[in-house]
């Protein structure tokens, strides 16, 4: 007990570092937190319309999974359906292109007469579900519904062009019917080529194309006879 009560034992505790080192530690810590970790963002209500962000932050288009390069590649393939189909062309099942083409198709038809947004979206949804179910029965490969919608949406482009020109020319004759039928065949050929490449069913091209032709045939009829 005498040993612990002896004040001389306190000489073994060195307090010489506390004054200077604590000051240096606190100053370094303060300097660390004072340094900005990133560039300051713009302030005010205009900041909501700016494109500034944190360094390394993905852009808004990347977060929305919108890639204009992929949209251009798939659109080019639809415009040139005789081109060799890459089996990985639809690995990124973006929905920006199909939604854009569907909106354009509905808008062009509404400019000519009554609005057909409800009919077009209903037929597109029901037809996509039916085709997805049929195509999954034809192949053992896994086919996602978003990929089916993406292929069908991109392949709608020829009929979108027909709907645009209907606002300029009349399609109430043999020439108009022939152009609509040609666009339907074009859509069917492009979509069936991509589905055959994705599902690897080269010997079932006609079976794949038949239900797709019925799907685009409905849109062709709406395009020709809409008033």
Curated annotation (Swiss-Prot):
Sequence ranges on the Cytoplasmic membrane side: 1-92, 136-150, 200-205
Function: Required for fusion of ER-derived vesicles with the Golgi during ER-to-Golgi protein transport, probably by mediating correct membrane localization of ypt1.
Subcellular localization: Endoplasmic reticulum membrane; Golgi apparatus membrane
UniProt record similarity statement: Belongs to the YIP1 family.
Superkingdom of source: Eukaryota
Keyword Transmembrane part of the UniProt annotation: yes
Membrane topology note: Multi-pass membrane protein
Transmembrane segments: 93-113, 115-135, 151-171, 179-199, 206-226
Gene: yip1
InterPro entries linked: Yip1/4-like, Yip1_dom
Principal location class: endoplasmic reticulum
GO cellular component: endoplasmic reticulum membrane; Golgi membrane; trans-Golgi network
UniProt GO MF annotations: small GTPase binding
Gene Ontology terms describing biological process: endoplasmic reticulum to Golgi vesicle-mediated transport; protein transport; vesicle fusion with Golgi apparatus
A Pfam family assignment: Yip1
Natural source organism: Schizosaccharomyces pombe (strain 972 / ATCC 24843)
Assembly behavior: Component of the YIP1-YIF1 complex, composed of at least yif1, yip1 and yos1. The complex interacts with the ER to Golgi SNAREs bos1 and sec22. Interacts with the prenylated form of the Rab GTPases ypt1 and ypt3.
Sorted UniProt keywords: Endoplasmic reticulum, ER-Golgi transport, Golgi apparatus, Membrane, Protein transport, Transmembrane, Transmembrane helix, Transport
Stated name of the protein: Protein transport protein yip1
Positions on the Lumenal side per record topology: 114, 172-178, 227
């Amino acid at each position: 007990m005498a040993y612990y009560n002896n004040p001389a034992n306190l000489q073994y505790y060195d307090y010489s570092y506390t004054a200077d080192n604590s000051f240096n530690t606190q100053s370094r810590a303060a300097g660390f937190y004072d340094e900005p970790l990133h560039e300051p963002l713009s302030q005010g209500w205009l900041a909501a319309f700016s494109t500034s962000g944190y360094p390394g932050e993905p852009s808004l288009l990347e977060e929305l999974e919108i890639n204009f390069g992929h949209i251009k590649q798939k659109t080019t393939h639809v415009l040139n359906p005789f081109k060799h189909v890459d089996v990985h062309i639809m690995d990124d099942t973006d929905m920006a292109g199909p939604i854009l083409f569907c909106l354009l198709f509905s808008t062009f038809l509404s400019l000519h007469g009554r609005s057909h947004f409800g009919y077009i979206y209903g037929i597109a949804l029901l037809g996509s579900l039916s085709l997805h179910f049929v195509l999954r029965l034809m192949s053992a490969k896994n086919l996602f519904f978003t990929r089916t919608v993406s292929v069908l949406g991109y392949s709608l482009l020829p009929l979108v062009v027909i709907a645009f020109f209907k606002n300029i020319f009349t399609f109430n004759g043999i020439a108009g019917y022939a152009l609509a039928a040609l666009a339907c065949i074009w859509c069917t050929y492009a979509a069936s080529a991509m589905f055959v490449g994705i599902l690897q069913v080269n010997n079932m091209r006609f079976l794949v194309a038949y239900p797709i032709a019925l799907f685009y045939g409905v849109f062709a009829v709406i395009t020709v006879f809409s008033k």
